[in-house]
Amino acid sequence: MDKNFKNGCVLVIGGTGGVGSECVRTFHNHGAKVVFTYNSNKDEATKIVDELNGKVSAIQLDLSNENSVKKSLSEINQSNQGINTIINAAGFNIPQKYISEIDAETWRRVIDSDINGFFNLASHSIKILRESQGSLVFISSAGLFKYPPGDVLSVAPKATVEQLIKGIAKEEGANGVRANSIALGVIDAGIFHRLLNEENTFFDEEWHEAVMANLAIKRFGAAEEVSNTALFLASSHAAYVTGHCIPVDGGYHL
């Protein structure tokens, strides 16, 4: 896909996850210079760099640490002559619990990671994206369209971030910056695989049957189907697309 990738790099936040790592591969395979971040999984980051023959680079980054975010963005911008695209695919194992079961500490931890972390990223990257006339893509959840019980710790923060995405699109369009999101259904990779291995999981046969009943396309999604959508949104083919949330969910939202 022709993006006419401008000077600078594509920055993938959360590049060691199932979707994030596929974004790293997809953008690399389409000629972009890619830098990706990891929070704690250095071994997986090293594997991805080796897999792509050292042609991508990785740095450690904790989005909840504002000073670290500000410093890292500045360094990446300077060392790569700009950042033309930011893909935020960061995420972690979020407990599947009903609202009545969630303690205040867990709630605050998720809010700090997902909402405050995204704000730290957005607030310190907007000026950089103005310079490159760049694009921001946030990996969100199809739960925004059809709420799945027990998923509030994923859906509630992403609903807030979705409004931030719209705000960036509205406020920064005149400065050449676009902002969009991708609402994921069940993607057969990454966090979903880790959740399947947890004890007391929601993901039993009854859950599987209920999800399939809600899908127009009767299968789970693949990580590359998400990364290809991110590629489109970052490309010149989507130059007139901003403030939009694209479901990649097999029709779950219908």
Label each residue range with its predicted role:
Residues 9, 16-17:
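Conserved glycine-rich cofactor-binding loop
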Residues 30-45:
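Conserved glycine-rich Rossmann-like NAD(P)H-binding loop of the short-chain dehydrogenase/reductase
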Residues 89-96, 250-251:
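Conserved NAD(P)H cofactor-binding loop of Rossmann-fold oxidoreductase domains
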Residues 92-93, 135-174, 186-187:
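Catalytic loop of short-chain dehydrogenase/reductase
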Residues 97-99, 103-111, 207, 211:
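Substrate-binding pocket helix/loop in short-chain dehydrogenase/reductase
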Residues 128, 219-248, 253:
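C-terminal substrate-recognition "lid" of short-chain dehydrogenase/reductases
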Residues 173, 178, 241-243:
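Short, small/polar-rich loop/turn modules that mediate ligand/substrate recognition or access, typified
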